[in-house]
């Protein structure tokens, strides 16, 4: 983790050299990382699209085998195999930003320059957001991002809990980490919007 933090720090310093503000540098840094993750995102969205398409079939299986969990699980996995769907295939792109989050947190805590780096209303990117604006944005953007890819209404409560959890976590983290998370969420929301729009366009043409 220390090695990753060191390289991330070097990349951030390189960006800061050109933009002149660490807050802006974190935003540019985040966009750069998200662009690198685009191939994984496309794979994730393709998998989620397939999951959404077979959701009516899954609901039929629940009605048919709802009283037999073991049979339901077997038939569901059989359906996934027939449709060539890996239900866990979309997890990696969701985890990669989190994997970067901890080294970034370490970097923000160990780089002395960040303790005096200001951005907008924040006097230090190594400290918590004093007005809780970043945690609120983290909560809202996390919910919007997860709600856009939800396959059924039953996931809404889970999305709310996850969003509140991320908001609470962001309260305890340096503002710089929160800026990274909010920027990452906004980038993902835009990605999902474009993907969904393109999918509808293709359906209309077919």
UniProtKB/Swiss-Prot annotation:
GO CC annotations on file: plasma membrane
Keywords: Cell membrane, Chaperone, Membrane, Protein transport, Transmembrane, Transmembrane helix, Transport
Residues annotated as transmembrane: 22-42, 88-108, 130-150, 160-180
A GO MF term: membrane insertase activity
GO term, biological process aspect, one: protein insertion into membrane
Locations listed in the record: Cell membrane
Short name of any one Pfam family annotated for the protein: 60KD_IMP
Topology in membrane: Multi-pass membrane protein
CDD domains in the record: 5TM_YidC_Alb3
Chief location of this protein within or outside the cell: membrane
Oligomer and partners: Interacts with the Sec translocase complex via SecD. Specifically interacts with transmembrane segments of nascent integral membrane proteins during membrane integration.
Record-linked NCBIfam families: yidC_oxa1_cterm
Cited function: Required for the insertion and/or proper folding and/or complex formation of integral membrane proteins into the membrane. Involved in integration of membrane proteins that insert both dependently and independently of the Sec translocase complex, as well as at least some lipoproteins. Aids folding of multispanning membrane proteins.
Family label: Belongs to the OXA1/ALB3/YidC family. Type 1 subfamily.
Protein name: Membrane protein insertase YidC
Organism per entry: Caldanaerobacter subterraneus subsp. tengcongensis (strain DSM 15242 / JCM 11007 / NBRC 100824 / MB4) (Thermoanaerobacter tengcongensis)
């Amino acid at each position: 983790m220390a090695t990753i933090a060191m390289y991330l720090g070097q990349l951030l310093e390189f960006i800061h050299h050109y933009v002149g503000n660490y807050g802006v540098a974190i935003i540019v840094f985040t966009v750069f990382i998200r662009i690198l993750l685009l191939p994984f995102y496309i794979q994730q969205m393709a998998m989620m699209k397939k999951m959404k398409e077979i959701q009516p079939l899954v609901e039929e299986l629940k009605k048919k085998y709802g009283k037999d969990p073991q049979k339901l699980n077997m038939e569901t996995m059989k359906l996934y195999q027939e449709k060539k769907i890996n239900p866990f295939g979309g997890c990696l792109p969701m985890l990669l930003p989190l994997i970067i989050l901890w080294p970034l947190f370490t970097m923000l805590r160990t780089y002395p320059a960040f303790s005096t780096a200001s951005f907008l209303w924040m006097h230090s990117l190594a400290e918590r957001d004093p007005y809780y604006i970043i945690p609120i944005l983290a909560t809202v953007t996390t919910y919007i991002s997860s709600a856009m890819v939800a396959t059924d209404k039953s996931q809404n409560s889970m999305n709310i809990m996850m969003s509140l959890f991320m908001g609470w976590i962001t309260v305890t983290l340096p503002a710089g980490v929160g800026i990274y998370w909010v920027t990452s969420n906004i980038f993902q929301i835009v990605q999902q919007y474009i993907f969904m729009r393109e999918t509808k366009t293709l359906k209309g043409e077919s």
